[in-house]
Amino acid sequence: MPPKKPEPKKEAAKAAPAPAPAPAPAPAPPPEPAKEPTFDPKSIKIDFTADQIEEFKEAFSLFDRTPTGEMKITYGQCGDVLRALGQNPTNAEVLRVLGKPKPEEMNAKMLDFETFLPILQHISRNKEQGTYEDFVEGLRVFDKESNGTVMGAELRHVLATLGEKMTEAEVEQLLAGQEDANGCINYEAFVKHIMSG
């Protein structure tokens, strides 16, 4: 049987040109990130007792560097005063309640006690302090030998480079007397030391 010859393909009937596709709708603008509400000190209800307020005022006055004792502190001192009063806000929280000032405003703008008190109340309500177990668990990650110690050098590096970075001087002050002869730190004793004041 002779091989079949390929049949010539019939040209398909020319279809009418397809209408141009409709232009794609413009992409929707990306959704704006959810804005965190701005802090309004006037909206904060003060729950402190008169004695507590007097104590806070006394501590606040110790930070007052105005020449005439105007009972004002710089924005840059706000976090220090909050921490002196037993609070533990992050730097980001302090900046947020201050209205996110520019770096150059931190030592120029002043804050009086009447403005500071609602900030203190807000921070004290929102504090989520870690427990002893939280801190020990966090340090256990660095316990390579599972022997209850971490290398002092590694802890120094972490404290100075991660999260809310500490200065070298702050790290040295914090770790003073905590290292053994091998440069290791017993982290359970270290956490007890920190939490005791």
Swiss-Prot record:
The keyword Cell membrane does not apply. InterPro entries: CALM/Myosin/TropC-like (IPR050230), EF-hand-dom_pair (IPR011992), EF_hand_dom (IPR002048). SUPFAM superfamilies: EF-hand. Residues 18-32 have a biased composition (Pro residues). The modification N,N-dimethylproline is found at P2. GO terms for biological process: cardiac muscle contraction; regulation of the force of heart contraction. Keywords: Methylation, Motor protein, Muscle protein, Myosin. Residues 1-13, 33-43 have a biased composition (Basic and acidic residues). Gene3D superfamilies: EF-hand (1.10.238.10). It comes from the Eukaryota. GO terms for molecular function: actin filament binding; actin monomer binding; calcium ion binding. Residues 1-43 are annotated as: Disordered. GO terms for cellular component: A band; myosin II complex. Residues 56-93, 135-170 form the EF-hand domain. Myosin is a hexamer of 2 heavy chains and 4 light chains. Regulatory light chain of myosin. Does not bind calcium. This is Myosin light chain 4. It comes from Sus scrofa. The gene is MYL4.
